[in-house]
Amino acid sequence: MALKTFVKISTVNNLSDARYCAGMYVNLMGFNLEEGNKDYLSPEKYKEMTDWLSGLEYVGEFEASHPDAILETAKTYEGLSYLQITEELHIPMLLNSSFNLILKQEINDVNILQHLLAKAPSLKENNVILLLESDSLDLKDEVKDLIKAIAEKCKVLLGFGLDADNISSLLEELPIEGIALKGGDEIKPGFKDFDELADILEVLEEED
């Protein structure tokens, strides 16, 4: 079994999410490694979880840490393939590391998309994947047109505006590399309501 597109799961903080998503053959699984963040995962819990998993790659997710601190932290998490950051200025300081890079950007208005369109060729040149998230924008035509233009110039993971009803049409309409979904908190250990995440992944399952 496989999924119809490249899928990253972000902020995984429990074994229920991790095992379910691995079983659904997602490509990347992200863990927040920044102490103080509500989704922070300690090296011990990371190892405990990843010891159960196979067949996918791991992303260390950071919001505000300096690159030196990011690289130091990453040493204590065995098996990371990617680092996810939010600051464009940090890219040059991490390019020569052994990690692939994902730049996560929060899109509050179309001006940010215009800025990213100008930056996209540089991201492609440096093999940086662009992850777009938003709590405020809808996937209206203007927004989709800009995302399409960006995705034609660099690899884009779309992380907002997705649901089980529109995911198939969006993948046909936009030349994106894939999508990004978020894990969530367990109701209690071992019990999890997957809701939209599971609905979307089930739509993306390839039929044998």
Which ranges hold each PLM region?
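Conserved N-terminal beta1-alpha1 strand-loop-helix module at the mouth
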Residues: M1-S97, N108-L132, L137-D208
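ATP-grasp fold ATP-binding core
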Residues: N100-I102
